[in-house]
Amino acid sequence: MVLIRVLANLLILQLSYAQKSSELVVGGDECNINEHRFLVALYEYTSMTFICGGTLINQEWVLTAAHCDRDTIYIYIGMHDKYVKFDDEQGRHPKEKYIFNCSNNFTKWDKDIMLIKLDYPVNYSEHIAPLSLPSSPPSMGSVCRVMGWGAITPTNETLPDVPHCANINILDHALCRAVFPGLPATSRTLCAGVLQGGTDTCNRDSGGPLICNGQFQGIVFWGWYPCAQPRVPALYTKVFDHLDWIQSIIAGNTDAACPP
């Protein structure tokens, strides 16, 4: 899965346009058909163009990246092959969308997260099940799983019909600060990748999950172009640091207070 990468000067000046909205997993393999029951695919509804991944966290809610937002979205749940439909595959429209917009102790790097309430609940099935929210943040060095229908080549946008999966590592935040000028030391993001290169999220992997020890720890957010370069990790929105907001919105408090 290779994330959309941008030149350093564009990264500094145009954060909102440099995200991995089109990134795919580079260096991975086709996911096992039953290992991504929570992975959803977001399409722009009017053109039915694939735009991003997302993660089902219960029967009514999907968590994805804010930069994946579009005026019209259609969500496929339980999909593996884009062109071969499972009997239990389901489709939903957003009923409500909530984008994190807190300013206290949160910078522009910390806000790429969106909750989508589905127009009606999904039915869990052989290919559909939620992913658990984290009970604690991941530790540095953790081996984590990334997945998506994003680009599988570092430079040419070769998009697969099926999701690809790969293992990457949680890395020292200082490595990402060296790559992404302006990234604060206190950023509520995770730095993850493979230091020797060759494996990464990429274009159109945006919004998909970073899974560590079976828990939903990160959302594909930002990376470099070309993807999968040595010593160039990627950034993932840190789900654990947004838990209070997520749980408040799901509980019906749409005016949820910003986390500390």
Swiss-Prot record:
It comes from the Eukaryota. Disulfide bonds join C31-C165, C52-C68, C102-C258, C144-C212, C176-C191, C202-C227. GO terms for biological process: proteolysis. InterPro entries: Peptidase_S1_PA, Peptidase_S1_PA_chymotrypsin, Peptidase_S1A, Trypsin_dom, TRYPSIN_HIS. It is found in: Secreted. The keyword S-adenosyl-L-methionine does not apply. CDD domains: Tryp_SPc (cd00190). One of its GO terms (cellular component) is secretory granule. Residues 1-18 form the signal peptide. Keywords: Disulfide bond, Glycoprotein, Hemostasis impairing toxin, Hydrolase, Protease, Secreted, Serine protease, Signal, Toxin, Zymogen. Its EC number is 3.4.21.-. Glycans are attached at N101, N105, N123, N156. Residues 25-251 form the Peptidase S1 domain. Expressed by the venom gland. Residues 19-24 form a propeptide. The active site is at H67 (charge relay system), D112 (charge relay system), S206 (charge relay system). The keyword Transit peptide does not apply. One of its GO terms (molecular function) is serine-type endopeptidase activity. It is an enzyme of class 3 (hydrolase). Belongs to the peptidase S1 family. Snake venom subfamily. Monomer. Snake venom serine protease that may act in the hemostasis system of the prey. This is Snake venom serine protease 2B. The lineage of its organism: Eukaryota, Metazoa, Chordata, Craniata, Vertebrata.
